[in-house]
Amino acid sequence: MLLDTLQTQFRHYFPTQRNFVLGLSGGIDSIVLLHLLAELQLNLRAVHIHHGLSPNADNWAAFCEQVCKRLKIPFILQKVTVDRSEGIEAGARAARYQAIGEIIQPNEVLVTAHHLDDQTETFLLALKRGSGIKGLSAMQAVGFWQNFTIFRPLLNVSKAQIEQYALQQQFTWIEDESNHDSHYDRNFLRNEVLPIVNQRWQHFSQMVARSAQHCAEQQMLLEELLAQELQRYADFSEKRLNIEAFPQFSLAKQQQLIRLWLEKCGAQMPSTAQLMQIIQQTIYADVDKNPQLKLADFWLRRYQHHLYLTGELLEPDDFCQPLFAQQSLTLPDGIGELQHLGDSIIYQKSGKIDRLLLPKVLVNAPLQVKLTHQGKVKQYAKPMREEMKKRYQQAQVPVWLRKRTPLIFFHDQLVFICH
């Protein structure tokens, strides 16, 4: 019985969790899961993502709403715009999860109706892309996407079992006409390839699932073995990786440490070619070079012996403001906030707080805040003027942050670089 299978999965993975959100497309898989979940008497909400890709999309949304109303399950409709630049399938998936991330609550878990046949397709698509063990792990019963947890309780259940249950219970569901279009890779596998494979090897999907599980276990072991070293070299709060020792490591170890660091920083995984480019242009670059590479929505930059992962950084317009005692100053473009406490300066940015003690003669003195300074500068209480570039280097301020780092002046003398 599917209900028994579902109850076993919930008891195993979420024995005390009560709040769930179901991703409801209206297709046979999610309709079956909706009815099963309704019997478990959970605190359940259902969300339907309206992609706007089909002329029938409005009808599908209305159907899902009616089914939820009949089962007395709260229903949410989210409309999204699909970015097709990476393909419709990838764009729709990204838009779907982004929308769910906006509505799901911190105490809720997303439930999806992925099943055994979906797992086989995902594994074969990863194989086609030349993925390593991380990609070949395919889907796990419990996964994560940015800020929420995903639970796939039907991952060991075949499509045939789901169809049989739906027919026995006389459920109704929608049929997405695009599922028959073998132009899409997943549909090609589902419609053209797997029926032939399953005729030859009856338990093919179960064997693929076993291989995916082996890959997942190997990936977990790899991460466990590298965890201490990653902790030694990575600063995740600053999205920074110390690569000074990396030339001594094997290429495989370099690749895995960089992949794990990028993943934990929330970056999209680079391809093998991109990863080799990162290694060649950053790890083996001269120490005085500052290479930078675009990686999806991020920039990967090197400064001295560190890699940094940053977003797109704007250079603010010329900024110069007074800062008086007992005054706060909000800096532009999310650069942070300064407070003059009289005897010290507090600099807050991204939850991090630094306190800079003022020299006694500057207690309660009026100061000035800039975000850039050209040419030479005189450090407070020092006789000689130095190039500002040298002061940045001494303070280890990366090149791309030098117009986003607050400079505290007393008259024309530099008191602090807030970094």
Curated annotation (Swiss-Prot):
| UniProt GO cellular component terms | cytoplasm
**Top enzyme class of this protein?**
ligase
Q: What Gene Ontology biological process does one annotation of this record name?
A: tRNA modification
Q: Which domain of life is it from?
A: Bacteria
Decide whether keyword Secreted is in the record: no
Q: Where in the cell is it found?
A: Cytoplasm
- Tell me the keywords, alphabetical order: ATP-binding, Cytoplasm, Ligase, Nucleotide-binding, tRNA processing
> Which EC numbers does the record give?
6.3.4.19
Pfam families per record: ATP_bind_3, TilS, TilS_C
Gene Ontology molecular function:
ATP binding; tRNA(Ile)-lysidine synthase activity
Transmembrane among the record's keywords? no
Positions that bind ATP: S25, G26, G27, I28, D29, S30
Q: Show the catalytic activity.
A: cytidine(34) in tRNA(Ile2) + L-lysine + ATP = lysidine(34) in tRNA(Ile2) + AMP + diphosphate + H(+)
Q: What does this protein do?
A: Ligates lysine onto the cytidine present at position 34 of the AUA codon-specific tRNA(Ile) that contains the anticodon CAU, in an ATP-dependent manner. Cytidine is converted to lysidine, thus changing the amino acid specificity of the tRNA from methionine to isoleucine.
Xref: HAMAP family: tRNA_Ile_lys_synt
According to the UniProt entry, the note on domains is: The N-terminal region contains the highly conserved SGGXDS motif, predicted to be a P-loop motif involved in ATP binding.
Q: Which family does it belong to?
A: Belongs to the tRNA(Ile)-lysidine synthase family.
According to UniProt, the name of this protein is tRNA(Ile)-lysidine synthase
